[in-house]
């Protein structure tokens, strides 16, 4: 079973922080941004300062963080996944279909050359896939431990996303797509 959010936040915290800080800086005025539920994307919300963008998220915590900053934020509908606080399911996907995102920021449980970007939950995969399809650019926030890992359900191919990571030790990924390595 998937680790709960408290457990995930403590895993590779420094790396996630670097990735989140970099990702937040890519948000520009007039962007329409989807922020996925998850630990690294939630950290990203803490670093976002752009007032002139519109934010949509399926994560309760990210929505609260953004709203407290006075930013324009929409929370999708959907079923609440207790372990992660993510909103999923048909209602969430229907909300996403109404938006034309300039940027989507997604978390992942695994990245593999053959299987692409994966997650253990089919409903979350559907949400991620829809957000990616509705976005001009899709960023996947992914620390080094997620590479060469495959979870049950694929939501995107590597070539269709930009990966932001703390460290890339397998050069095959850089041949498949844009990979931004961030460090201190």
Name every feature range the model reports, one short phrase each.
Residues 61-184:
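Conserved phosphate- and dinucleotide-binding cores of soluble alpha/beta proteins
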